[in-house]
Amino acid sequence: MTSASNSPESYLSSKTRSSKLDDNYLKELNEDLKLRKQELLEILKPLEDKNNLLFQKLMSNLEEKQRSLQIMRQIMAGKGNDDSSVIELIKEAEEMKQNLERKNKMLRKEMEMLWNKTFNTEEFSDEEKVLQIKNKTDLQDGKAPKTPSSSRKTKNELETLCAEKGKEIRKRLFLPPGKETEENGMGQVSGTSQHHSE
């Protein structure tokens, strides 16, 4: 009987100690999330006008992560030692985790598509500007202007060049180091080569 009366006190003191440690850990995680939020703001600032929707999704995603951390804190604290409320909180945290994982996958795909599109259009417009300047200088030097067929050929070469540069960037951004994909198709997206088994 005496051992039974002593155990709740020792259990509570050890629980208090562990919840303090857990709370410190969760505070560190929260600080880390704030830093990541700030980094995202800086990364996405130049693209903010074009990518407002994506930006909002990323921010709401981070806010959801912070809410899940608050739930974790409540679980760790044991909120009034009521097991049923702790179980409910655990279920809620699990649902939130699965939801966040789904959202993260979708966001990664959207960001990859958006970056590819932005990069390709910017590269293409830069190359066209260079060509226009070159044509003007050729005319001033007395050289014959390019025929429509040759300019079409140049445009195709530019598109090929943009596609290849886009592939290189996708590899650097989304593939783990050392993982090379062998792609010979002109406009092939990296995602399609990875899922060819499906």
UniProtKB/Swiss-Prot annotation:
Keywords: Coiled coil. It comes from the Eukaryota. Residues 24-117 form a coiled coil. Residues 135-144, 154-167 have a biased composition (Basic and acidic residues). Residues 135-198 are annotated as: Disordered. The keyword Iron-sulfur does not apply. The keyword Zinc-finger does not apply. Residues 187-198 have a biased composition (Polar residues). This is Putative coiled-coil domain-containing protein 196.
